[in-house]
């Protein structure tokens, strides 16, 4: 019996809720998980099939981003995303959470790059959607359904990904702002929001630190010089360019005991929205992605005492358009699972959940509060 067959059998036979566990690097949502038994997937790893000429690779869900990068680099190829998390995050977690990748090569999202998945449903059925070639569209909607479902509809065990040729240059350029007053942010934010920068950028601030601008350069080396020149208008540009896979700032090293919030706003409201966010959380790590209008706040474990207050703060920040996506995080001894999800509301959602996980055994969330569940977003 294969590992996937054993996994399916366990799901069929369980009488207890299960929480899906990947590499132990991702933040899991909400907790406490009421009587949920861990369902580890880190043994499901390795390359299933790789055809470099087609720019397609199929890997087991427990394969890490670092392992994927090492395999594809040997053929001068790469997975185009650099999502939040660490290089030791698993591909299954990246797909299940549709992990944000704010400095993605070519501005891709997870859904753009997932061609197919193998999933074990809450019924214990092994199913496939999509395929291992770029033009295969069989079951495509089911691929999108499971991407970002946080494991609530099925356990992703295998993923087929679209790859890209590795560019000759792929680095991050960092600029530390000289000024951090309202006037400086007032000058900077409109330019970021209007997308006048020559390349994808982020505004990042470490706890009690000075805001920094991060820009990704992929392809033509001359573009790196253009980005440095652009950033010098705002601050001091680091002399050393950081390779994307060695990023040490906004993309990696989220604390293992933290609370994470994410909120979005329209471009027209971005300047007051981001300024208010930076003021509201002076002790948090904040990252603003102008391309997506998304503000991400990572708060230390001590902030758990003020969780409801911080949640209310993020609601007020997002009130300009009501797009609120809190991801509350509680790490259980370094192990991790999926982010919180709201209970199904529409008839369609109820029907899909019942069809794929009728017993509600996969990643069932024990509510923190009605407020959290009411605004959490799958």
Residue ranges and their predicted role:
Residues 1-20, 41-87, 99-132, 167-177, ...:
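N-terminal glycine-rich flavin-associated loop
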Residues 12, 19-21, 26-32:
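N-terminal low-complexity or amphipathic/hydrophobic leaders
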Residues 19-20, 200-207, 285-290:
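Short beta-strand
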Residues 28-45, 71-73, 94:
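Glycine-rich loop at the start of a catalytic domain that most often binds anionic cofactors/ligands
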Residues 32-35, 42, 235-378:
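Conserved glycine-rich FAD pyrophosphate-binding loop
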Residues 66-68, 180-187, 221-229, 269-276, ...:
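Short, conserved charged micro-motifs
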Residues 96, 115-257:
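C-terminal substrate-binding/cap subdomain adjacent to the FAD-binding core in PCMH-type
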